[in-house]
Amino acid sequence: MNAKKTQVSLFFLLLLCVFFLLSLSFCTKAESPQKDYGVFLGIGGNAETKQPDEEKLQKLKNYRMVVLEPTNFSPEQIREIKADGTKVYGYLNIGALENFRPYYEDFKKDSLAPYENWEEEYWMDVSNPQWQDFLINDLGQKYSSMGIDGFFLDNTDIYYQYSQEEIYQGLKKILTGLKQYSLPVILNGGDTFVQRSIEEGKALSLFDGVNQECVFTKIDFSKPAYLSQDKESKAYYEEYLEKAKAAGLSVYLTEYRADSGLSQEIEQYCKENGFLWYNAESLELR
């Protein structure tokens, strides 16, 4: 009789151990990132911002991969975001110059023209050796030393705006130079540059992925308003992203305020193709 009681007690003890381990497993999973991808250029971790640091950092930790403006964060904050497994990509605008940057006065003479719909930006001459050197050896080094996991480079669309050979070669030189930091590179937009790179068999030697905005949505900058993309543009982008995928590039989408029905369509499209996407609330990317 005592032997049976002992066996029953051991059985319940084992059940309790299993239950405890399962509970611990669920708790651990709950703390790991739950969402795939987010672009948060409007979020800062600095003390002078209105939202408490911890609240912002916790929001970013909920993602497996985030794109941030590095100057909005300290290296310590980037380490904290990464602590639970989040990958942090640093934004770097290589094809345009913003008037709020501390180096604006140094390079404004090398700008080419105002950037439509973005009053604070100007297209840059990427063939300029001083601009190339600054991006590669100053900003590139600074951002990589902060502990980012990759670069998110904006405005290679300069090659669409100015389709000269020196612009194309200038972009290639910048990308080649940034490779010295051994970090993956994602290009935001730049489909004209990307497609030529693919055709010449150079894409994977220069960058690792592409992010395309507004495949399924579009922005009316006059309001602003967030709308569904027209069929022709959507078809063009889908064909372009298919080429990028076939070339071995990773593919990301950033959409703006897609409603629940459209979000389901985008989610299905991305699952079928192995893409990641982010549904931004607004242009502020917060």
Features from the language model and the residues they span:
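Intrinsically disordered, low-complexity segments enriched in Ser/Pro/Gly/Ala and basic residues
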Residues: 8, 22-24, 31
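Bacterial N-terminal signal peptides
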Residues: 12-23
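Glycan-processing catalytic domains of CAZymes
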Residues: 28-286
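Bacterial N-terminal signal peptides that target proteins for export
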Residues: 2-13
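Short, low-complexity interaction segments enriched in Ser/Thr/Pro/Gly
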Residues: 1-2, 26
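Compositionally biased regions
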Residues: 10, 24-26, 145
